[in-house]
Protein backbone atom coordinates (compact mmCIF):
# COMPACT_ATOMS: atom_id res chain seq x y z
CA UNK A 1 0.00 0.00 0.00
CA UNK A 2 1.38 3.37 -1.01
CA UNK A 3 1.63 5.90 1.82
CA UNK A 4 1.67 9.59 0.85
CA UNK A 5 3.34 12.48 2.61
CA UNK A 6 0.13 13.61 4.33
CA UNK A 7 -0.55 10.05 5.52
CA UNK A 8 2.88 10.01 7.15
CA UNK A 9 2.22 13.39 8.78
CA UNK A 10 -1.14 12.19 10.14
CA UNK A 11 0.45 9.05 11.61
CA UNK A 12 3.36 10.99 13.11
CA UNK A 13 1.04 13.61 14.62
CA UNK A 14 -1.12 10.83 16.05
CA UNK A 15 1.94 9.21 17.61
CA UNK A 16 2.93 12.55 19.17
CA UNK A 17 -0.70 13.39 20.06
CA UNK A 18 -0.42 16.65 18.14
CA UNK A 19 -3.33 18.29 16.28
CA UNK A 20 -3.56 17.83 12.53
CA UNK A 21 -2.55 21.43 11.84
CA UNK A 22 0.44 23.08 10.27
CA UNK A 23 3.00 24.48 12.69
CA UNK A 24 1.89 27.99 11.77
CA UNK A 25 -1.77 27.16 12.47
CA UNK A 26 -0.86 25.82 15.91
CA UNK A 27 1.06 29.00 16.70
CA UNK A 28 -1.92 31.15 15.63
CA UNK A 29 -4.20 29.10 17.90
CA UNK A 30 -1.74 29.49 20.79
CA UNK A 31 -1.56 33.27 20.28
CA UNK A 32 -5.35 33.48 20.33
CA UNK A 33 -5.48 31.53 23.60
CA UNK A 34 -2.82 33.70 25.21
CA UNK A 35 -4.53 36.84 23.95
CA UNK A 36 -7.73 35.77 25.70
CA UNK A 37 -6.15 34.67 28.98
CA UNK A 38 -7.00 37.97 30.69
CA UNK A 39 -10.63 36.79 30.78
CA UNK A 40 -10.00 33.76 32.97
CA UNK A 41 -11.54 31.37 33.45
CA UNK A 42 -11.78 30.92 29.69
CA UNK A 43 -14.91 29.29 28.29
CA UNK A 44 -14.07 27.42 25.09
CA UNK A 45 -16.26 25.40 22.74
CA UNK A 46 -14.88 23.10 20.05
CA UNK A 47 -16.69 21.45 17.15
CA UNK A 48 -14.79 18.25 16.40
CA UNK A 49 -12.85 16.55 19.18
CA UNK A 50 -9.33 15.31 18.56
CA UNK A 51 -5.71 15.65 19.49
CA UNK A 52 -6.19 19.42 19.32
CA UNK A 53 -8.55 19.10 22.31
CA UNK A 54 -5.82 17.43 24.31
CA UNK A 55 -2.89 19.46 22.98
CA UNK A 56 -4.33 22.91 23.64
CA UNK A 57 -5.76 21.94 27.03
CA UNK A 58 -2.25 20.91 28.02
CA UNK A 59 -0.94 24.18 26.56
CA UNK A 60 -3.29 26.24 28.75
CA UNK A 61 -2.58 24.19 31.85
CA UNK A 62 1.19 24.56 31.33
CA UNK A 63 0.70 28.33 31.47
CA UNK A 64 -1.52 28.23 34.55
CA UNK A 65 -4.54 29.54 32.64
CA UNK A 66 -7.89 28.64 34.21
CA UNK A 67 -10.27 27.30 31.57
CA UNK A 68 -12.99 24.86 30.63
CA UNK A 69 -13.43 23.28 27.21
CA UNK A 70 -16.64 21.76 25.89
CA UNK A 71 -15.99 19.66 22.77
CA UNK A 72 -18.54 17.78 20.67
CA UNK A 73 -17.77 14.80 18.45
CA UNK A 74 -19.96 12.76 16.06
CA UNK A 75 -17.90 9.54 15.92
CA UNK A 76 -18.46 7.34 18.97
CA UNK A 77 -15.22 5.35 18.77
CA UNK A 78 -13.14 8.51 18.37
CA UNK A 79 -15.09 10.22 21.14
CA UNK A 80 -14.32 7.37 23.54
CA UNK A 81 -10.65 7.36 22.57
CA UNK A 82 -10.24 11.11 23.13
CA UNK A 83 -12.23 10.94 26.38
CA UNK A 84 -9.91 8.17 27.61
CA UNK A 85 -6.81 10.19 26.71
CA UNK A 86 -8.19 13.26 28.48
CA UNK A 87 -8.75 11.20 31.61
CA UNK A 88 -5.24 9.77 31.43
CA UNK A 89 -3.86 13.30 31.13
CA UNK A 90 -5.70 14.36 34.29
CA UNK A 91 -7.78 16.91 32.38
CA UNK A 92 -11.22 15.55 33.22
CA UNK A 93 -12.12 18.59 35.32
CA UNK A 94 -11.15 21.05 32.59
CA UNK A 95 -12.43 19.26 29.47
CA UNK A 96 -15.92 17.88 28.81
CA UNK A 97 -16.28 15.81 25.65
CA UNK A 98 -19.84 15.44 24.36
CA UNK A 99 -21.09 12.83 21.88
CA UNK A 100 -23.76 13.43 19.27
CA UNK A 101 -23.47 10.33 17.11
CA UNK A 102 -24.33 10.26 13.40
CA UNK A 103 -22.85 9.03 10.12
CA UNK A 104 -21.10 11.79 8.16
CA UNK A 105 -22.56 12.91 4.84
CA UNK A 106 -22.78 15.91 2.53
CA UNK A 107 -26.39 16.91 3.22
CA UNK A 108 -27.29 19.73 5.66
CA UNK A 109 -28.07 18.66 9.25
CA UNK A 110 -31.55 17.17 9.56
CA UNK A 111 -31.63 14.35 12.11
CA UNK A 112 -31.98 15.09 15.85
CA UNK A 113 -28.37 14.02 16.46
CA UNK A 114 -27.06 16.24 13.65
CA UNK A 115 -29.05 19.24 14.85
CA UNK A 116 -27.96 18.56 18.42
CA UNK A 117 -24.33 18.64 17.25
CA UNK A 118 -24.74 22.04 15.58
CA UNK A 119 -26.75 23.53 18.44
CA UNK A 120 -24.67 22.09 21.29
CA UNK A 121 -23.16 25.44 22.42
CA UNK A 122 -26.65 26.98 22.58
CA UNK A 123 -27.94 23.99 24.55
CA UNK A 124 -25.22 24.53 27.15
CA UNK A 125 -26.82 27.89 27.95
CA UNK A 126 -23.66 29.96 28.09
CA UNK A 127 -21.50 32.21 25.96
CA UNK A 128 -17.92 31.48 25.01
CA UNK A 129 -14.63 33.32 24.72
CA UNK A 130 -13.50 31.05 21.89
CA UNK A 131 -15.42 28.78 19.53
CA UNK A 132 -13.37 26.47 17.32
CA UNK A 133 -15.04 25.23 14.13
CA UNK A 134 -13.15 22.16 12.92
CA UNK A 135 -15.66 19.34 12.52
CA UNK A 136 -18.83 18.56 10.58
CA UNK A 137 -21.40 21.06 9.19
CA UNK A 138 -19.01 23.99 9.48
CA UNK A 139 -21.24 26.53 7.73
CA UNK A 140 -24.11 25.76 10.10
CA UNK A 141 -21.75 25.73 13.09
CA UNK A 142 -20.46 29.19 12.15
CA UNK A 143 -24.02 30.50 12.14
CA UNK A 144 -24.78 28.84 15.49
CA UNK A 145 -21.61 30.33 16.97
CA UNK A 146 -22.87 33.88 16.51
CA UNK A 147 -25.59 33.47 19.13
CA UNK A 148 -23.31 32.07 21.85
CA UNK A 149 -20.12 34.07 21.38
CA UNK A 150 -19.13 36.74 23.88
CA UNK A 151 -18.90 40.24 22.32
CA UNK A 152 -15.09 40.21 22.50
CA UNK A 153 -14.91 36.47 21.83
CA UNK A 154 -13.32 34.87 18.78
CA UNK A 155 -14.38 32.18 16.31
CA UNK A 156 -11.50 30.11 14.90
CA UNK A 157 -12.26 28.40 11.56
CA UNK A 158 -9.78 25.74 10.46
CA UNK A 159 -9.34 24.95 6.74
CA UNK A 160 -10.64 28.42 5.89
CA UNK A 161 -9.18 28.19 2.38
CA UNK A 162 -12.24 26.09 1.47
CA UNK A 163 -14.59 28.65 -0.08
CA UNK A 164 -17.62 26.45 0.64
CA UNK A 165 -17.38 27.58 4.27
CA UNK A 166 -17.37 31.30 3.48
CA UNK A 167 -21.13 31.92 3.30
CA UNK A 168 -21.69 32.99 6.95
CA UNK A 169 -18.38 34.84 7.40
CA UNK A 170 -19.74 38.22 6.31
CA UNK A 171 -22.17 38.24 9.24
CA UNK A 172 -19.31 38.81 11.68
CA UNK A 173 -18.45 42.48 12.22
CA UNK A 174 -14.71 41.78 12.40
CA UNK A 175 -12.79 39.09 10.57
CA UNK A 176 -9.32 38.18 9.36
CA UNK A 177 -7.94 35.53 7.02
CA UNK A 178 -4.48 34.42 8.12
CA UNK A 179 -1.92 32.43 6.17
CA UNK A 180 -1.71 28.98 7.75
CA UNK A 181 1.38 27.80 5.89
CA UNK A 182 1.98 24.26 4.61
CA UNK A 183 2.32 20.76 6.01
CA UNK A 184 5.43 20.14 3.94
CA UNK A 185 7.63 22.08 1.46
CA UNK A 186 6.09 22.62 -1.98
CA UNK A 187 2.66 21.42 -0.86
CA UNK A 188 0.25 22.74 -3.53
CA UNK A 189 -2.48 23.60 -1.03
CA UNK A 190 -2.21 26.93 0.80
CA UNK A 191 -3.81 26.55 4.23
CA UNK A 192 -5.65 29.41 5.90
CA UNK A 193 -7.19 30.21 9.25
CA UNK A 194 -10.12 32.60 9.63
CA UNK A 195 -10.85 34.52 12.81
CA UNK A 196 -14.16 36.27 13.39
CA UNK A 197 -15.68 38.34 16.19
CA UNK A 198 -18.75 40.39 16.95
CA UNK A 199 -16.90 43.24 18.66
CA UNK A 200 -13.17 42.43 18.73
CA UNK A 201 -11.39 44.58 16.17
CA UNK A 202 -7.88 43.38 16.95
CA UNK A 203 -7.88 40.08 15.09
CA UNK A 204 -4.95 41.00 12.87
CA UNK A 205 -2.77 41.04 15.99
CA UNK A 206 -2.73 37.25 15.74
CA UNK A 207 -1.14 37.13 12.30
CA UNK A 208 2.36 37.26 13.84
Model region roles, listed by residue range:
Residues 1-130, 136-150, 154, 160-208:
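A short alpha-helical cap/connector motif
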